Amino acid sequence: MDCLRFFLYLVHCMLKRTLLISLMMCAAAFSASGRYWNTGLGGVTLQHLSMQASPRSAALSGAGVADPARVSEVTRNPLAITRIQAAEFGLNQIVFGDAGADDFVSVYYGLPLGESFALSFGLEYLGYDDIEGRDENGELAAEYGAYAWAAQAGFGNRGQAFGWSVSARFAYQTIDDESTVAILADGGVIYRVMEYVSFGATITNFGYVTDSEYDGAHEAAPLALQAGVTGIVPVARIFNLQSLWEVHLSADIYRRVDMDAPEWRFGTEIAYQEFLLFRAGYALRPNTEDGFSAGIGFSFGGIIFDYGYSPRPALGDGNHYLGLGVRF
């Protein structure tokens, strides 16, 4: 056991320095023009790996990178590993509107490792029913299918003030007779000031994608940077109340490689312990419609349920996000 602790300590020290240097470079990229890493609109493949997968993240419009609540967010926010306090298994599902995909399910598992570390695992699947085909002249052709899946594993430190995490992901996508394989990595650091303010930054989907040509243009992985700050307002303490209400306020900036300007994301979570949570978010997006989102969560014993809704006004519908987790 002593040898294991010493090994984990060495890994912690090495990765801590590496992640700090890497994320400082990533933060500098936000202030740059994007000249060296902007692929142009529509220049990425496997875009589902950058959409929200958990009900909580969807309800907050993607904000809250510095305030992950549970391991249920780990497939999109590697810093969720830093919040693993007990073993948890669960799944998330997205019910798309009429113009969306047909099925998205993700399964996750988190496990504390020793006093300061944690492991996470995730598996997700996105599927479509048969899609109407068109030839080069726009005429109807044979229908074709499309699906994608990804598997990942992560490791991180659960420090009280400073935390870090890394994840590795294998992703596969098939559209008609074209397939894409990717080997990707996520990383993040978080710093908590006392118990009321936290800062976080992540880099996601960094890695290798096999050559795949669609309409003559090569597509890259959906590499993205996100940084944010969260403040926690202890309502009960301020007003000397007996109840345990808290308000979490988050503001984030997010940029994916195919964006010519960043997204600004804002989220609010009103929490009564972990028993009852109300969430709302708003995102300012440069190349598509802005929009509000909302959701709710509650827990009973070791069972946690989450729901989120993200409207899509241009399509006249929205996506429903459902999550169920069990702690043991």
Segments the model singles out, each with a brief description of its role:
Residues S33-F328:
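Subset of outer-membrane beta-barrel
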Residues M1-V44:
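Cleavable N-terminal export/targeting peptides
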